[in-house]
Amino acid sequence: MDDQNKNLILATALSFLVILVWFILFPPPEQTEAPATEIATTNGTAVQTPTAAATEGGAGEVPALDSAAPTQAEAPRVQIDTPRLKGSVSLLGGRIDELSLKDYRVSLDEDAEIVEMLTPAGSTSAYYALYGWAPGAGLNAADVPGPLTEWSLESGDTLSVGTPVTLSWSNGSGVTFRRTLAVDEDYMFTVTQSVENGSAAPIGAAPYGILARHGIGEDADLPGLKNFFILHEGVVAMNDGTLSEIDYKDVRKFDIDPNEGAQAEVFQNKSDGWIGFTDHYWMATLIPGSGTAFKSAAKYDARRKIYQAETVLPTMSVAPGESAEVTTRLFAGAKEWESIRAYQQDGVQKFLDSIDWGWFFFLTKPIFWLLHQINGLIGNMGWSIIGLTLIIKAIVFPLALKSYVSMAKMKELQPQMEALKEAAGDDRQKMQQGMMELYKKEKVNPAAGCLPILLQIPIFFSLYKVIFVTIELRQAPWFGPFRDLSMPDPTSIMNFFGWLPWAGPEAGSLTATILIGILPLLLGISMWLQQKLNPAPTDPTQAMIFAWMPWVFMFMLGSFASGLVVYWIANNTITFTQQYIIMRSHGYKPDVFGNIKSGFARRAKADKK
């Protein structure tokens, strides 16, 4: 067996096996968005609010707040209106519980609704941010604002960029609480909570923030989740530089924490951190001020099917006639790289790690950064992927050059190798020994041909991860029918790639996998042409593997994101060009058309037999 073909087949087979196992175990998930919120009365809408003692290891209280569900929709509201957000703040509890993202729609349809980020209690799968004060010395639960407190609008009208609003509430005992909300041009809210002690005695209270998310049904399901192996959905937290990721299913498995009175996992932060919930493209995060010690916790209320993320700051003591305030932040929006990076530069510790870069983060991060920079210049993600491929091929070219030169030398040595085989006869040991001596003498590495293929495996999976998790690829168009590079090729042989007046098969169906689109077809052709740089192997087994490999890959990758298939086509095309030029420059002229012709001739001859 030709050593070069043997190694090439082994490398190709390994790539095929890795992708096949991945495809079988973790098929591409259906690309679904969270449905529009339907208003419905939902039982069990209570959230667990901490007490000041909870910051010092004491037990928290779980007030009965079921009455909040039917009243939230009727409560007075303060509108939120920015270039990128719209929604409202409920004066019942001062909740930020209605928020939509103006720049994103649930689908590519022209009349598709914009994405809802937060929804009030009483809606399907409610999701909201709640702030308050846990009572300490001199106060009880009725003396501090909680989830059902009726706040008054003290100043401001509509919460917008540069126009904050202030809410106030007095407890009737001389203590006044205020909450000032501000929002920037993207997705960050600034929440300033203050307390003014007009009573005759000192008081203590601990400011807290809560993100609450209500599950549906017995399993506490959350609509719109992908539930896909390579994607983290659930709690994401940064604790003094250490990232923690806890899937929703694992949150439901928490042990009861006696200090919290609930299923919980608690983190003690010395100076920096944040905690929240992350989905495929969207995230809500509580961010205390940098340099502040605080406690954060992820909780699950099994009875009410509520997931919670909370931060509790140390108890603040306020003397009579004095006041105190604390400022924290809330991120609620899309996980855009530019926005997240800007917030990280503004002091949110390692905020870019909230994007799920995966196991190959050392590759996915630079690959996305490079793709993002190219897209900033070109303005089209499809052409940017091709540009990225060119740059990657240029980076690995020194290694590829050695491989292609070695392959060319192997072709030059073909007559000597055939002579060794004839001289050795059936003595395989003698033949192998002679081959090794020949390789050593001519300084040829017979395994060099597999290196370019093996290099593609980590790059392929890293780019797959980038295309799947980054919102910049969501609904990113290329040209013509390719309106979303994060989705499979929408074209099909069934309607001759859109030229015939009927619809193609439904995306993700078996029919769509069989009646492939134009991109998978080009992928198969590009792999087939790349094979034709060399004559077909004389060994029948090798020849059969080579013959089937391009078309198997074509159908396998047909259901992958079209952006990934574009990368593979570009990679094959560049590899073909590089290999052709290098092999010619070293004295071996690939006879592509001759190899194609001989392949058909050999097949016709086999059919006659």
From Swiss-Prot:
Biological process terms from the Gene Ontology for this record are: protein insertion into membrane; protein transport
Q: Quote the Pfam families the UniProt record gives.
A: 60KD_IMP, YidC_periplas
Question: Chief location of this protein?
Answer: membrane
Q: Which Gene3D superfamilies match?
A: 2.70.98.90
Q: Name one GO cellular component term.
A: plasma membrane
Membrane-spanning intervals of the chain: 8-28, 381-401, 451-471, 509-529, 545-565
Assembly information from the UniProt record: Interacts with the Sec translocase complex via SecD. Specifically interacts with transmembrane segments of nascent integral membrane proteins during membrane integration.
Tell me what this protein is called.
Membrane protein insertase YidC
